[in-house]
Curated annotation (Swiss-Prot):
Keywords: Aminopeptidase, Glycoprotein, Hydrolase, Membrane, Protease, Serine protease, Signal-anchor, Transmembrane, Transmembrane helix, Vacuole. This is Dipeptidyl aminopeptidase B. Residues 1-29 are cytoplasmic. It is a single-pass type II membrane protein. It comes from Saccharomyces cerevisiae (strain ATCC 204508 / S288c) (Baker's yeast).
Amino acid sequence: MEGGEEEVERIPDELFDTKKKHLLDKLIRVGIILVLLIWGTVLLLKSIPHHSNTPDYQEPNSNYTNDGKLKVSFSVVRNNTFQPKYHELQWISDNKIESNDLGLYVTFMNDSYVVKSVYDDSYNSVLLEGKTFIHNGQNLTVESITASPDLKRLLIRTNSVQNWRHSTFGSYFVYDKSSSSFEEIGNEVALAIWSPNSNDIAYVQDNNIYIYSAISKKTIRAVTNDGSSFLFNGKPDWVYEEEVFEDDKAAWWSPTGDYLAFLKIDESEVGEFIIPYYVQDEKDIYPEMRSIKYPKSGTPNPHAELWVYSMKDGTSFHPRISGNKKDGSLLITEVTWVGNGNVLVKTTDRSSDILTVFLIDTIAKTSNVVRNESSNGGWWEITHNTLFIPANETFDRPHNGYVDILPIGGYNHLAYFENSNSSHYKTLTEGKWEVVNGPLAFDSMENRLYFISTRKSSTERHVYYIDLRSPNEIIEVTDTSEDGVYDVSFSSGRRFGLLTYKGPKVPYQKIVDFHSRKAEKCDKGNVLGKSLYHLEKNEVLTKILEDYAVPRKSFRELNLGKDEFGKDILVNSYEILPNDFDETLSDHYPVFFFAYGGPNSQQVVKTFSVGFNEVVASQLNAIVVVVDGRGTGFKGQDFRSLVRDRLGDYEARDQISAASLYGSLTFVDPQKISLFGWSYGGYLTLKTLEKDGGRHFKYGMSVAPVTDWRFYDSVYTERYMHTPQENFDGYVESSVHNVTALAQANRFLLMHGTGDDNVHFQNSLKFLDLLDLNGVENYDVHVFPDSDHSIRYHNANVIVFDKLLDWAKRAFDGQFVK
């Protein structure tokens, strides 16, 4: 319109008389106004969506699908609308009741801690009334309880303070049921565990071990006195807690309570990492500096020793443990009592190439190597499921033995070592499937060994058992005719179990009597044993789901082409299609890949969940894809071990191949393919963008990533990469180093917490420096002050997911296109 006005103003005045000129001026002004109105109306009409007359029309940003159901949103996910309820039973751990198992457990009901029986609903024994008690004038809250095996006393923790991921300090008390009295053990106690005979409690305070007598109601002896800020007794240091035990316990009672085995961990030679905290106290003008002993790849590990303490004579002895250690470092990965006087100890060298198993005789005070095994190109994964099998002549078990998990035919299977002092074993299971974690439980009355495996599918978990006398005669416990992921916990005598169905449908829990001869093939879930009752049906969740259009997962095995040997690359995957998906649309849907991809991990498993991926599918109208590429677990040793010494290579290739497949689909917009990952997934996101160079993945979102494996802890990293000294080139290639390739993507996002004690913020800072040095600018950064690896401090968890969703929306809207 501006150009039109200029033309009018240049008309020569002499062609008009004054009146005509004034009239023409008025007409021109009116005309201009009319043109402006018409032009504005056209623009307005163009901005309004064209409504169809069909009743199922919805606005593009509607909260409803075409069939009138609600879409999944962050608000309902965050308030746990779709979170199934699960219950844990604290089974009474008393071996004396094995032959008369009533399924006793401790629970909180009717404002009391009580002992109940799954077999006899009328059984009710009150242990403690209420969740508070008064001690020395203070009103204290019960935060956790552990009943003594004889049910006469309770071990209570209060004033809990979180330490690292698995560890907590607290004040511990013993409640005596007969006298209704509370006796304090101590404050700032790191660990407290009942002896199996209910007489004593071993506890750790100031990194020393003490014995508290429940009978005399006092601490009667100190087991150690050399504990310090760098010497840990009975309690793991940071790396043993995080990577070895995944627990806060490094002390183990013998079955009768006569001995206590424990680790003495010396981290004096371990390098120190300082983490600054900026917003802990608003009054602070200087950061609070916290120190952590953190062994990085190729640097000294903590030195661990096994000690055994005798309750009878009050002495400790240190059995000699040595093995094939290339550099003098030894990891003690598992300690298991195999009888009252013998301890089985698993060790590996620091790179997990050699497994050495020792048998310690606590009476003779000797140690012998009973197994010495190579990983044969893979690695020894740390496990904690070695299961003691007691001698029983009736069932042809003349010696104490144990069941362990071993690679048999390239897959993880059960092996029965009939004599704990021998390396000879009986193969219990075999085939192209895997036992998950290890043996689950042993029913000595029935000679049954229970386990969970992928026998039906690597994306499912079903419960089975075998009789030790009949190897490979596998009996199904759960119904394999239906897809399912199951778990089970057993009562002391293994007669009863809490069977938990985790998906893919709505989860439930029920109590099963596995000694019942009635096989309930018509019953939902189990085909063995009698279902007594449901502990949880999640009926409220089932009702809620009727109102929502939850995008469904579709599981499949993707063929990503041929590997270097000409074999098909078959990987597990699932996709989530958006609501009202229309495959006839062309170049329409963005694809949001979510990846983790760490060695021996698994994301593609048929559990029930409604979370961030479903929000993305619903709110961004995107296809969500998850691919478990090579290196991940439960598809055999060859599939997972080829990533050894070259992390980030095959994993990234497989994500790229999957993106190429999806980009070729007619309904996918190949310019809108993104990848998101956290932790190892954050690392994999950056490595994939680096290797892809913008060909398939146009966007990436990386949260708390490792960017250089020299910066991560030694125990995890060296298991898959060896040391930097042994594998220098591998560490260079596995780092995120070719940052100019990331510049070929449209844009990427980096987020990290500054207080991350696991994947240090150092990783992101070093990466950002590389970007600066190479002039790479196509990225965004968000830093979360003082947040650890979970990114939760000061509302950070809300922000991190809001940011991810908003950033992905902007990417798919084309706001980052160069």
